[in-house]
């Protein structure tokens, strides 16, 4: 295994945040979510970043966290009618390229979970 892969596997857990309640301008999410880096300067998830994080999670076999991330995006889509740039109130006026259904497709390809697919497509 390369040193880069080892570093990612060892430190990935530090990118996971759990904040179910709104705090200041941070929008709480129902499931644990990943942020762009391990240090505390980012406490929010970002739409585009989360897609690429999920690609890595699926490659590492961490389907459950990829589903958590995608379920959080579905939560925000259902709440606001679209996925904001991230889960902060000051991101509500912007979004990023639409990758939600690509995330759903990639998870479904690995799991075959038709119930989850149906729930995800209802967003």
Predicted regions and their residues:
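Acidic, mature catalytic/reactive cores of soluble proteins
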Residues: 1-123
């Amino acid at each position: 295994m390369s040193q880069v892969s080892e570093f990612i596997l060892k430190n990935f857990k530090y990118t996971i945040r759990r904040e179910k309640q709104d705090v200041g301008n941070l929008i709480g999410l129902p499931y644990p979510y990943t942020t762009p880096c391990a240090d505390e300067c980012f406490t929010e998830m970002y739409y585009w970043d989360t897609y690429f994080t999920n690609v890595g999670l699926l490659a590492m076999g961490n389907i459950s966290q990829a589903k958590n991330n995608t379920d959080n995006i579905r939560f925000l889509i259902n709440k606001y009618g679209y996925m904001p740039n991230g889960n902060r109130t000051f991101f509500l006026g912007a979004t990023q390229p639409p990758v939600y259904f690509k995330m759903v497709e990639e998870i479904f390809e690995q799991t075959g979970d038709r119930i989850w697919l149906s729930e995800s497509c209802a967003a």
